[in-house]
């Protein structure tokens, strides 16, 4: 796991609060948290660090958290051609049989929905979009599968919560709103009567 925005100890502790135990696989030599932010490397040097870690643990999966942090961790002279360098790195890793999961923080307004400012969706097989939306005066979280190369997938926009047991997707998709992907949806279903308290936020099942 290549991380760029948080030190391994803090990353491990925060993951544990979400019900994800990273300590045990690290102790067993099955997982390595590779903190590359302070090294100021080129893309080729970064890839070599990652390949060395993959070889040490015999990994078949790599998490890059995040691409924004990855770019900022590079020496300034290598940021201009980040997209091309990233393409070479991903091609080399997938060619070696490594499955890659990467996160991208997207800064946008509520009325926009870009996938990423890197325009690298062509590199990916699958894209899951997660964002906040405003519903009844509350910020809630929704997710939607944007792309699944080579297969069909659900088109539903689903609400989710993050608990101490991990990510929990809530109930059936909502049909009471449209425009959820804008972050400011419009209600299409029945409203609560004036003066009535709005329905509480759905709770995750234990």
Where are these regions (language model features)?
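Conserved P-loop
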Residues: 1-45
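Short, conserved catalytic or adaptor-binding loops enriched in Gly and charged residues
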Residues: 20-28, 119-123, 161
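Alpha-helical scaffold elements adjacent to nucleotide-binding pockets in ATP/GTP-utilizing enzyme cores
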Residues: 10-15, 49, 119-123, 144
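Conserved P-loop NTPase
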Residues: 48, 52-57, 61, 125-126, ...
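A short beta-strand-to-loop transition that corresponds to the Sensor-1 phosphate-sensing loop
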Residues: 5-6, 103-106, 149
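Extended hydrophobic-aromatic, low-complexity segments
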Residues: 1-2, 11-13, 22-26, 60-64, ...
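P-loop NTPase motor core
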Residues: 40-123, 127, 135-137
């Amino acid at each position: 796991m290549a991380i760029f925005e948080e030190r391994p100890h803090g990353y491990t502790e925060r993951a544990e609060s979400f019900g994800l135990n990273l300590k045990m696989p690290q102790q067993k030599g099955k997982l390595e948290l590779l903190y590359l932010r302070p090294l100021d490397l080129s893309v080729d040097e970064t890839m070599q660090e990652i390949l060395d870690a993959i070889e040490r643990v015999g990994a078949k999966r790599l998490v890059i958290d995040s691409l924004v942090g990855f770019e900022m961790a590079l020496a300034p002279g290598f940021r201009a051609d980040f997209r091309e360098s990233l393409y070479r790195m991903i091609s080399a890793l997938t060619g070696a049989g490594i499955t890659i999961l990467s996160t991208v923080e997207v800064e946008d307004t509520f009325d926009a929905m870009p996938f990423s400012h890197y325009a690298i969706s062509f590199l990916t097989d699958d894209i899951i979009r997660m964002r906040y939306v405003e519903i009844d005066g509350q910020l809630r979280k929704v997710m939607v599968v944007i792309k699944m190369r080579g297969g069909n997938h659900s088109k539903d926009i689903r609400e989710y919560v993050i608990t101490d047991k991990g990510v929990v997707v809530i109930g059936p998709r909502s049909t009471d709103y449209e425009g959820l992907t804008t972050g400011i949806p419009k209600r299409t279903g029945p409203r609560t009567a004036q003066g009535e308290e709005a329905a509480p936020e759905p709770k995750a099942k234990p």
